[in-house]
Regions:
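P-loop NTP-binding module
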Residues: 1-305
Length: 305
């Protein structure tokens, strides 16, 4: 069972965390009244603050509410969602962005109804550049058309620029801080970095989840060369190195339509959707006709939990 795997790995009560995340979901839904929030990025000021478990709990709460939800692991330096869920897809984010795998092959069902996973490969060089690519932005747009919610798990904004880069592309950002652990100045710096990236900050999520001492900083080493990590459940995972020739692979060098065909989505789904009109008192929003179209081969009906 996926739930047992989560509890064993994270040493947490998932059900309790999901219940608490329902409040976060309610706040996100409230924030969506005027400006829709479908893509949510979860980051933290530093390591071991409960970022990834919070992202999973929020995604699970969304799925339990009957929403087709995708959790997207974009922490290419220390991925964890596949391990937490006990799901190991054949391909990940980078395979899709490079056009080597169709989106259908990369998106995997989980044991939680309505919840899907798009994992990431380990040891990808220059993760921030990958997240800043035109293809990543287009992929997010395609996913937001196929799912009710997309939850993006990124590295801590206080340690790497990855989160700030991706924060500008999503509908909203939640910053995880750990009670009695996160420093006030670190939180202020993280918020300033997100604001500088023009991110829409939904709020702070305070956690106090007990976690074992980890080697997160070592795992996030400068050269990104570490290939083995001892997990908290005693299992040793061997990570594959990314071949040098793949590291320089450009993600914007060819025609976007050709790439769309390779990953199995329509070019129209990669285009930026028109902004929905803002609701004002006494006035109803008029749906945009183009937003109603379901033209992608990666349509909502493609994956049914």
């Amino acid at each position: 069972m996926a739930n047992k795997s989560i509890k064993k790995f994270a040493k947490i009560d998932l059900e309790e965390l999901v219940r608490k995340s329902e409040t976060l979901l309610a706040n996100i839904q409230f924030a969506s009244i005027d400006e829709p929030v479908k893509t949510v990025l979860i980051t933290s000021t530093g390591p071991d603050e409960g970022k990834s478990t919070t992202a999973l709990a929020l995604a699970t709460a969304m799925a339990k509410a009957g929403k087709r939800t995708l959790i997207m692991d974009c922490d290419m330096r220390r991925r964890s969602q596949g391990k937490l869920l006990g799901v190991h897809p054949a391909a990940g984010v980078y395979s899709v962005l490079s056009g080597r795998a169709p989106l259908k092959k990369a998106v995997a069902k989980t044991n939680i109804p309505n919840l899907y996973l798009l994992d990431c490969e380990p040891n990808i060089a220059n993760p921030a550049s990958v997240l800043a690519s035109q293809r990543f932005a287009a992929l997010l747009r395609a996913l937001s058309r196929s799912f009710d919610y997309v939850v993006v798990d990124t590295p801590p904004v206080g340690a790497f620029v990855d989160a700030a880069v991706a924060a500008a592309l999503v509908d909203g950002v939640a910053l995880v801080v750990r009670q009695r652990v996160s420093k006030k100045q670190a939180v202020a710096d993280a918020l300033a970095q997100l604001k500088a990236a023009d991110a829409r900050i939904l709020g702070l999520v305070m956690t106090s989840v007990p976690q074992e001492k980890s080697d997160y900083y070592y795992y996030y080493n400068e050269e990104n060369r570490r290939v083995k990590k001892k997990h908290s459940d005693g299992e040793s995972a061997t990570l594959q190195q990314t071949p040098a020739e793949e590291m320089s692979l450009g993600l914007d060098e060819d025609d976007m339509q050709a790439w769309a065909r390779r990953i199995g989505v329509s070019a129209e789904d990669l285009q930026e959707a028109p902004k929905a009109p803002v609701r004002h008192a006494g006035h109803a929003a008029t749906p945009n006709a183009s937003a109603k179209k379901a033209s992608s081969s990666f349509a909502p009906g493609s994956f049914k939990g």
